[in-house]
């Protein structure tokens, strides 16, 4: 049997039965669990973008931007009329263009606490032909549902396992620490590790800018038994270091690292880091994506698009 590449290993959700109401059972072969069907890794016709957002609540990015700039988040939700992530035709146009650019699969990094609409992802995949992987998880402490603070890590893990068994979920992510990692975020990371053990779903993370807590995230996950080869530590392109010391430390342990905000002004400063990692022998550990999240990034609006 053909040996899978590291990228295919990360993409494969190997632990769940496809049916929504059937109990979880091991899959006999590696699969990619998309929102519509399970597919074999070798059938993906193009690159996989491991961290995009195709469905978010209208108020998510205004809240995110306010918190990132140290301001109070908006008091009321943004009206949904005309919101681009609720425009099926517009998003299908974008996904069709992304397919033509050579992308063969997209992993959506949203989940309920970010306003992800799973039904929309299914309709988007069906209309555009783009295989889409949906995720489960809890983003970062400023966005956690209130109950997460009081729940035990076992309760959080059980909830993630429930989501993965009842819905077509193919990954756990994006799981984040907002700035310095908090005790509650540590609890969520431990729960994610336990959910991974029960589901085999790969994990991808959000690190606070510029890449804070990257090593700590992998430490927590590995301590509860998550193999580093099943983890992608995200937003490492924001950690600008020509010596790529943190990047190499993560790769040496077997983890993937994400350069996942591509398509903007910061790309040029990341090229030397990518070249340094390739020269160090870590090309197979590198994952790329755009973290699509705003209308300005769409091709129709003059942006680079997901591809």
Predicted feature residues:
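Short acidic/histidine-rich active-site segments
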Residues: 206, 260-261, 283-303
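Alpha-helical scaffold segments that flank or form the walls of functional sites
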Residues: 41, 45, 50, 55, ...
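Distinct, well-ordered alpha-helical segments
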Residues: 119-122, 147, 182-187, 210-225, ...
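C-terminal segment of N-terminal export signals and the immediately downstream linker at the start
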Residues: 20-42
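Active-site gating/metal-coordination segments in enzymes
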Residues: 123-127, 131-202, 253-256, 262-264
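Divalent metal-coordination and catalytic microenvironments
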Residues: 51, 106, 196, 257, ...
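Active-site glycine- and acidic-residue-rich loops that bind
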Residues: 112, 237-241, 260-274
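N-terminal secretory signal peptides and thylakoid transit peptides that target proteins
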Residues: 1-17
């Amino acid at each position: 049997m053909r040996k899978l590449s590291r990228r295919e290993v990360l993409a494969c959700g190997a632990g769940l039965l496809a049916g929504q109401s059937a109990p979880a059972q091991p899959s006999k072969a590696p699969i990619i669990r998309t929102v519509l069907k399970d597919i074999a890794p070798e059938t993906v016709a193009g690159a996989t973008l491991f961290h995009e957002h195709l469905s978010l609540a209208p108020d998510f990015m205004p809240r995110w931007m306010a918190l990132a700039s140290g301001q109070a988040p908006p008091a009321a939700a943004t009206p949904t009329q005309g919101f681009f992530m609720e425009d099926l035709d517009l998003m299908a146009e974008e996904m069709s263009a992304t397919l033509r650019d050579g992308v063969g699969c997209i992993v959506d990094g949203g989940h309920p606490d970010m306003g992800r609409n799973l039904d929309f992802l299914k309709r988007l995949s069906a209309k555009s032909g783009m295989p889409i992987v949906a995720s489960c998880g809890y983003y970062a402490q400023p966005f956690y549902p209130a109950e997460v603070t009081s729940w035990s890590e076992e309760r959080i893990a059980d909830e993630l396992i429930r989501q993965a068994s009842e819905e077509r979920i193919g990954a756990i992510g994006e799981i984040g620490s907002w700035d310095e990692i908090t005790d509650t975020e540590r609890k969520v990371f431990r729960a994610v590790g336990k959910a991974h053990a029960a589901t085999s779903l790969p994990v991808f993370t959000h690190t606070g800018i510029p890449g804070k807590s990257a090593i700590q995230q992998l430490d927590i996950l590995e301590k509860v038994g998550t193999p580093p080869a099943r983890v992608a530590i995200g937003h490492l392109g924001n950690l600008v270091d020509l010596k790529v010391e943190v990047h190499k430390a993560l790769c040496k342990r077997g983890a993937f690292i994400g350069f996942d905000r591509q398509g903007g002004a910061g790309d040029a400063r990341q090229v030397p880091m990518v070249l340094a990692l390739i020269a160090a022998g870590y090309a197979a550990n590198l994952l790329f994506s755009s973290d699509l999240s705003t209308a300005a990034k769409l091709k129709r609006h003059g942006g680079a698009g997901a591809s």
